[in-house]
Structure formats: structure tokens, C-alpha cells
């Protein structure tokens, strides 16, 4: 039982990060107006897909931020700021 308890305490922070990442990816994908209208993608001719939303979420969540997908609208910028602040406080508390 002690081994399972240690496993759970080690995987819990990972699961929290995974849940927050999944939540923000869903927000980015179903953002009012669509991902294409709220975020500028490096190739504007290509329709944004789930992979683009996941990619943007992971680069924002990991604080890498390559800059090839950028929030254009005020709402998208505020959502991205909320994602960054959420991750910042999660990292501080875990």
C-alpha cells in the first residue's frame, strides 16, 4: 500500500498539469469565432486543426513559446494570459 501511495503522490502533479493543458486546449479549439480568427498561424492558408491547438497549448504550458502561433484578438490574449498565470501558480504550489 505504501508503494501505491508514493506512486500516487508522484503522478498527481503530472495529472494536474495534464488536466489544465487539456482544459485550455479545449478552450482554444472552441473559442468563440474559431481558432483561425483568434490566433494567427504561420501558414494562414492552412485551416487550423486539433494538432495546432494542442501544439499552441503545449508550447504555452511549457513556457517555450516559439512564436509561430500568436493570439490576435483581445479575448485570445486574455485566455493565453490566464493559461500562463494558471501554470505559474500550479508550479509554485506543487
From Swiss-Prot:
Keywords carried by this UniProt record: Glycoprotein, Ion channel, Ion transport, Membrane, Transmembrane, Transmembrane helix, Transport, Viral ion channel
Gene Ontology CC entries for this record: host cell membrane; membrane
Pfam family of the protein (one): Ion_trans_2
Topology with respect to the bilayer: Multi-pass membrane protein
Keyword Glycoprotein: yes
One MF term in the entry's GO annotations: channel activity
Gene Ontology BP terms: monoatomic ion transmembrane transport; potassium ion transport
Stored SUPFAM superfamilies: Voltage-gated potassium channels
List of glycosylated residues: 38
TM regions (residue ranges): 14-34, 74-94
The keyword Membrane appears for this protein: yes
Subcellular location: Membrane
Family: Belongs to the two pore domain potassium channel (TC 1.A.1.12) family.
Function: Potassium-selective channel essential in the virus replication cycle. May be involved in preventing multiple infections (Potential).
Protein name: Potassium channel protein kcv
Organism (species): Paramecium bursaria Chlorella virus 1
Gene name of this polypeptide: A250R
Amino acid at each position: 500500500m505504501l508503494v501505491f501511495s508514493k506512486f500516487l503522490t508522484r503522478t498527481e502533479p503530472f495529472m494536474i498539469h495534464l488536466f489544465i493543458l487539456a482544459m485550455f486546449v479545449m478552450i482554444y479549439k472552441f473559442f468563440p469565432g474559431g481558432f483561425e480568427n483568434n490566433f494567427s498561424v504561420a501558414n494562414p492558408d492552412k485551416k487550423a486543426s486539433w494538432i495546432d491547438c494542442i501544439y499552441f497549448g503545449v508550447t504555452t504550458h511549457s513556457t517555450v513559446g516559439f512564436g509561430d502561433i500568436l493570439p490576435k484578438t483581445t479575448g485570445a490574449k486574455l485566455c493565453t494570459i490566464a493559461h500562463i498565470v494558471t501554470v505559474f501558480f500550479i508550479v509554485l504550489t506543487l
